[in-house]
Amino acid sequence: MRDDQVLVSGLIAACREIIAAHADHLSELDRAIGDGDHGTNMRRGCEAVYADRDRFSQMPLAQAIEEIGLTLVLTIGGASGPLYGTLLMEIGRRLAAGGEADFSAALTGAVEAVARRGRAQRGEKTLLDVLYPVQDEVIRRHALSAIAERAETSATLTVGMKALRGRASFLGERSIGHMDPGARSCALLTSAICHYLKEHRAA
Ligand code: ADP
Ligand code: MG
């Protein structure tokens, strides 16, 4: 297998593993401020990608990322499926277009696309409250361990926020005091990806 085939396959396995290990907790977080399905949704998406990992790892990296995004849209469902799907499809497209060979530029454009899709911005207690800080760290070319740490602390910071988007917004003030499930899944995935890259690739 080529290096990037091993990379794609390994990253898919690492993401699937972390979501499987935390699916119950993600659903528990979603039970507090949503409808309790976020762990099930994320697990379904990651299992579908994992089942097709050989096909993805045959593709050029940018195409694999885009196709994984499409699979996530079709399998995660809920509000988070189209958002995670948009993120990956946009990263893949931007990398493939070549004009943005730089990963941080592709990520920045993709995070903007997620924000447009969710009509959301920073501070509204969603997965964007992890994506934006991660994007900032990537732009500054911080070390992988720093990116992972920032993702974790950013998810924790959603505890104090009032939800303004998605189901949790129906709770208004009562959403304060709970961590946003999408922010948590986003931190878990970021952390799994950073740790995998740190172990298998120079930063
Ligand atoms: P659903 O809310 O449809 O049950 P999930 O439970 O899978 O979907 O996902 C909920 C997560 O999706 C939230 O915790 C939040 O992070 C994210 N989310 C929901 N709506 C939006 C939005 N409009 N913009 C950004 N993120 C959102
Ligand atoms: Mg839900």
Question: Locations of the language-model features?
Answer:
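N-terminal loops that bind phosphate or other acidic moieties
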Residues: 1-203
